[in-house]
From Swiss-Prot:
One of its GO terms (biological process) is lipid metabolic process. Its EC number is 1.14.14.14. The lineage of its organism: Eukaryota, Metazoa, Chordata, Craniata, Vertebrata. Keywords: Heme, Iron, Lipid metabolism, Membrane, Metal-binding, Monooxygenase, Oxidoreductase. This is Aromatase. It is found in: Membrane. Its cofactor is heme.
Amino acid sequence: MAAHVFPMCERTRKPVHFSETVMEILLREARNGTDPRYENPRGITLLLLLCLVLLLTVWNRHEKKCSIPGPSFCLGLGPLMSYCRFIWMGIGTASNYYNEKYGDMVRVWISGEETLVLSRPSAVYHVLKHSQYTSRFGSKLGLQCIGMHEQGIIFNSNVTLWRKVRTYFAKALTGPGLQRTLEICTMSTNTHLDGLSRLTDAQGHVDVLNLLRCIVVDISNRLFLDVPLNEQNLLFKIHRYFETWQTVLIKPDFYFRLKWLHDKHRNAAQELHDAIEDLIEQKRTELQQAEKLDNLNFTEELIFAQSHGELTAENVRQCVLEMVIAAPDTLSISVFFMLLLLKQNAEVERRILTEIHTVLGDTELQHSHLSQLHVLECFINEALRFHPVVDFSYRRALDDDVIEGFRVPRGTNIILNVGRMHRSEFYPKPADFSLDNFNKPVPSRFFQPFGSGPRSCVGKHIAMVMMKAVLLMVLSRFSVCPEESCTVENIAHTNDLSQQPVEDKHTLSVRFIPRNTHTRNRKA
């Protein structure tokens, strides 16, 4: 037989594919098996082998087509190594690493569970808009440590309870609550700017992030709690709670069995729980002494829900806690990055100041002005695209699904790399900070600073009002001047739950230089 095959190859000089040669030989033998001269089962056996080869070939091609790129399993080393990388580098940094290495759809493992890291716009949008991804993932023991396991709204994966508490958040963050926001933001920002001398050191520097956090926590208190509090003390406890949240979110179970390892984190979480409980008790006492109850705020609504048996005391405390912490470590840092970007882009700052003067003139800021501040809104959107504070979202599939042709089993963890998605080629200058990126309307599938769909950020509208108001008040009264070397690109930062600047004096110290004229009805 070889004498027939190889001379033929020699004469034709054509490449011979192994699978084609095997098929030809098998078919020849199968034909021989049907010849009366060959009464044996060889033909049937070879036909069965042929079918098996074909099935294996098709299966292999199917697997290659339907498997998402990522590190190999390698006898369990792949899951272990990827999990260690997420713990060591932080969730955000590790996700960027895997997307950079394997592409915009990557399969990794966290705590032994298959996890997808998605930055492809169409895939991210698919997950955001479908209700089967309303659950989040994280260590059960870690979430219990910080009070978020099946409580509150941020990481509550009890979908039924999450929907119930979301209605209270939605009521507080829209409607009359949204209408009051602008007035309170203006008043709080101006009050803190009037007292700027108390935060200024001997060299004339101000810790700008501390200032912004004080403004934001004061706004949150006035809107949602409205009780006397010590801003600095509460901010210290919020910061420790946030550090704990980042630390325990994906830690393995054995971490929580080693008491000496996580005692400080558990104590930090408990400190904030106790502080929030004290504030709620203050509000409860006020309600008991009030003669008339009108226009109930967020905390008051929750207290009444608890009294009617709709919510537990623990859930009320966690909801108030999450409402209070949401802005200081997201919105305040977003505004901090925006102030840095303005100093790196002086022409953009000039355009914003001109617009403020044109739209407001000598009048006080009103809701009707906000829709006319097109340059300011464009700047905020570009800042959120170029350097988002929260650039990842965490989901878990509640049902089997198919994303971009790939099968996603129920229970799969999903990390949505929104920050990387925002650098897609849809934008004219995806790698640069430029208002040109928003010269035309951007479809929602390419721009998701607050998410979309059933689990989108419930406070996205109020956040835009707060950012516009705080920026406008600060810029109209002061020129904010950081150190020359302090830019968004070169300041040290971490990226775990969110992008956080490393808080050292050099990074956060800026000068507030009063403007000679400003666009408010206020004397210079």
